[in-house]
Every structure is written in structure tokens, then in C-alpha cells.
């Protein structure tokens, strides 16, 4: 009888482990698979905690997470479980987008903002962003493409990762310059955010900055270095060696700001070139976004620089293609489809409030067909 009881206990334990392992495999969310966290009706708290712990261990391995102490790991697990419940509940609502356990799943919303929000919402000293150009103002005769994706035209470099440096202002500026340089010269060159972080002293490096000030620096200081000449360190550094004779710096002639709160003008601009935008990325949905057309909670407290590299429509929902700087494990391989043509003229997350674009070699709208 003792042997029979032991065998039965071992069998039951094996069933529990197999059940938890299956739940883990079907629940870990990534941008590279088709499995999602799903709501489990009637799930008991204890079972949820057991599954969440297994998922957390798997997630740590996937994202290379190591914590300094057992106490810190427990704290991160608690945050992870809370984010998991949030994801489970939101995904059960059958929205146009999905959330997932990305690299930020062990961060509270406040912590996420502390490391990710680097766009300075204050105007530059000369208030240049208060004036805008009518270059891309729409008119009755405009016929724009139904969809645009500058990635397909080879005008977008690979997704980059700003790391723990609050340098989104540099990444968004650089992305727009890279795109325009490809359109004008035919050559896609990966440019240097570190050049701006180290040398653009009007901005604050990893402490944040303004895209307008970054454009002005590129215009007035010999262009922008390449990533090969000035590789990214995710740290503030010393400005040196940026104007060596053998450096292949990329120049721009200037930049312009789009009319504020005008998604139609933004659409016309994006039909011609990638555009820098500053958005509010401070919602939990933005933090944990995985896929689909995002129309979730979003304010207009502008704090994060991105690049708008296209637009389109999916299942009747218009969207912007937004390139982020948080690596290719966030969102759709580093991109977000953000809802377009919403009722608010500021655009979702304020995307139409503060958008700008570089100019190069007298590039103008008549050089690109929009029909």
C-alpha cells in the first residue's frame, strides 16, 4: 500500500508540473510567435501564481535578466505578475491590438517612464517649433497613396535600441535624416545617435533633449557622423574626432515643422519622407504593446521621440507605422501600428502635435510622386 500511495503522489505531481509547463508554453508572449496570454475562466489565485512564476523564469532567460538579490527578484516577480494580469484582462477584451510580455514586463509604469521618456516637451530657446511650414499643407487637388511604407523602399535602417539612455530625441532625429538621405542620394547610411549625445551640448544627452535642437546642430556643425565612425554607447561621452577628414558625415540643409494638430499634413509629409514625431508613450498599454492597430489609452503629454515611416489600413482601421528605439523585441519587431484619423485633431498619443522633418539638397515635394 505504501508503494501504491507513493506512486499515486508521484503521478499527481507529474500532472501538475506538466499542466504548468503547458500553460507556460502557451502563455509566454513574444513578437516572434503566435501564442498569447489568455484569460483562464475560474482560475484560482494559487494556480495563477504558480504559472506566473514559471513564465517569469522563462521570460528571464529569454531577455537575459539577472537580478542582484533574491529580494530584488521577488520584487520584479510581483511587478511581472501584475503586468501579466493586466495583459490577460486587456487581451480578453478582443481589442484591435494585443499586449505581451516584452522586455519591459518587470517594470512598473513609473520605472518604464524613467528610462524611456527622453523627449523634452519644452520649446527650444528660440521657440522655432512654434512656427510651421505649409510645404505639406493639404489642398483639394492632392491624391496621396492609400499606403506608404518606407521600409519597402530601403529608406529605413534596422531597428535600434536606446537602452537605459533617455536618447529617443536623438534616435528619432537620426531616423528621419537617414530616410531623407536615402531618398536624395540613393544610399542608406546608418548614422550616429552617439554623435548627437556627445556633441550636441544644447541637448542633455542621456538626460533628454529636443529634436528641433538636434536638427539645428546637424545643420550648423558639419553634418552627422556615421555609426561606424561614432558607435552607440548608451552613455554620455566626450565629443571628439567627429570632423576627421576620412569621416563621411551626412549633411542636411535645414528642417521644418508640420502644422500642429493636422493629421492630413502629417500623412502628406510621410508620403514624401520619414518624419520625426514626439508622442506620449506613458501608458501601460504602450509599454506592453505587442501587435495590431493600437488605439489604447494615450494622453498628449509629449515625452518620447519616434519616426513615422509609413501609413496604411488594416481591417478597416487606419494606422501610422511608427519606428521605435526600444529594440526589435518590443511591438511588431520594433514597430507600432498607431491608429490614424481619430476624432482628436492632435492624433493618438499626440502624434500630430509636434512633427518635423529634415531638408536636403533643395529636396521638395515635386520630386516625389504622390499619385
Swiss-Prot record:
Residues listed as glycosylation sites in the UniProt record: 94
Disulphide connectivity of cysteines: 165-206, 199-239, 298-349
Gene3D superfamilies the record matches: Cysteine proteinases
Active-site residues, Swiss-Prot/TrEMBL: 168, 304, 324
Induction cue: By wounding.
Domain of life: Eukaryota
Molecular function per GO: cysteine-type peptidase activity; peptidase activity
Enzyme Commission no: 3.4.22.-
Expression sites by tissue: Expressed in roots, inflorescences and siliques.
InterPro entries the UniProt entry points to: Papain-like_cys_pep_sf, Pept_his_AS, Peptidase_C1A, Peptidase_C1A_C, Peptidase_C1A_papain-like, Prot_inhib_I29
Signal peptide (residue range): 1-23
Keyword tags: Disulfide bond, Glycoprotein, Hydrolase, Protease, Signal, Thiol protease, Zymogen
GO biological process: proteolysis
Enzyme class name: hydrolase
Propeptide: 24-143
Short name of any one Pfam family annotated for the protein: Peptidase_C1
Similarity comment: family membership: Belongs to the peptidase C1 family.
Function noted in UniProt: Possesses protease activity in vitro.
Protein name as catalogued: Probable cysteine protease RDL5
Species of provenance: Arabidopsis thaliana
Protein encoded by which gene: RDL5
Amino acid at each position: 500500500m505504501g508503494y501504491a500511495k507513493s506512486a499515486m503522489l508521484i503521478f499527481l505531481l507529474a500532472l501538475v508540473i506538466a499542466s504548468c509547463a503547458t500553460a507556460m508554453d502557451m502563455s509566454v508572449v513574444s513578437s516572434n510567435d503566435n501564442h498569447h496570454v489568455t484569460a483562464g475562466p475560474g482560475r484560482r489565485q494559487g494556480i495563477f501564481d504558480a504559472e506566473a512564476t514559471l513564465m517569469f523564469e522563462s521570460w528571464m532567460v529569454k531577455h537575459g535578466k539577472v537580478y542582484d538579490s533574491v529580494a530584488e527578484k521577488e520584487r520584479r516577480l510581483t511587478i511581472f505578475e501584475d503586468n501579466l494580469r493586466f495583459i490577460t484582462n486587456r487581451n480578453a477584451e478582443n481589442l484591435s491590438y494585443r499586449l505581451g510580455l516584452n522586455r519591459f514586463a518587470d517594470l512598473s509604469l513609473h520605472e518604464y517612464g524613467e528610462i524611456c521618456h527622453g523627449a523634452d516637451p519644452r520649446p527650444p530657446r528660440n521657440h522655432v517649433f512654434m512656427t510651421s511650414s505649409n510645404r505639406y499643407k493639404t489642398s483639394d487637388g492632392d491624391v496621396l497613396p492609400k499606403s506608404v511604407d518606407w521600409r519597402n523602399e530601403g529608406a529605413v535602417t534596422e531597428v535600434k535600441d536606446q537602452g537605459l539612455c533617455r536618447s529617443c530625441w536623438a534616435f528619432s532625429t537620426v531616423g528621419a535624416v537617414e530616410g531623407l538621405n536615402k531618398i536624395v542620394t540613393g544610399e542608406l547610411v546608418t548614422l550616429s545617435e552617439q554623435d548627437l549625445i556627445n556633441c550636441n551640448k544644447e541637448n542633455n544627452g542621456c538626460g533628454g533633449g529636443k529634436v528641433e535642437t538636434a536638427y539645428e546642430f546637424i545643420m550648423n556643425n558639419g553634418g552627422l557622423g556615421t555609426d561606424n565612425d561614432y558607435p552607440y554607447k548608451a552613455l554620455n561621452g566626450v565629443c571628439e574626432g567627429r570632423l576627421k577628414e576620412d569621416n563621411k558625415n551626412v549633411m542636411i540643409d535645414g528642417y521644418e515643422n508640420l502644422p500642429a494638430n493636422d493629421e492630413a499634413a502629417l500623412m502628406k509629409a510621410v508620403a514624401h519622407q520619414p518624419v520625426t514625431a514626439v508622442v506620449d508613450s506613458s501608458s501601460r498599454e504602450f509599454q506592453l504593446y505587442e501587435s495590431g492597430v493600437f488605439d489604447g489609452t494615450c494622453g498628449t503629454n509629449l515625452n518620447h521621440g519616434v519616426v513615422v515611416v509609413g501609413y496604411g489600413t488594416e481591417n478597416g482601421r487606419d494606422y501610422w507605422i511608427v519606428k521605435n528605439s526600444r529594440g526589435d523585441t518590443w511591438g511588431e519587431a520594433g514597430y507600432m501600428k498607431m491608429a490614424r484619423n481619430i476624432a482628436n485633431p492632435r492624433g493618438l498619443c499626440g502624434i500630430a502635435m509636434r512633427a518635423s522633418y529634415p531638408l536636403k539638397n533643395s529636396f521638395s515635394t515635386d520630386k516625389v510622386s504622390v499619385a
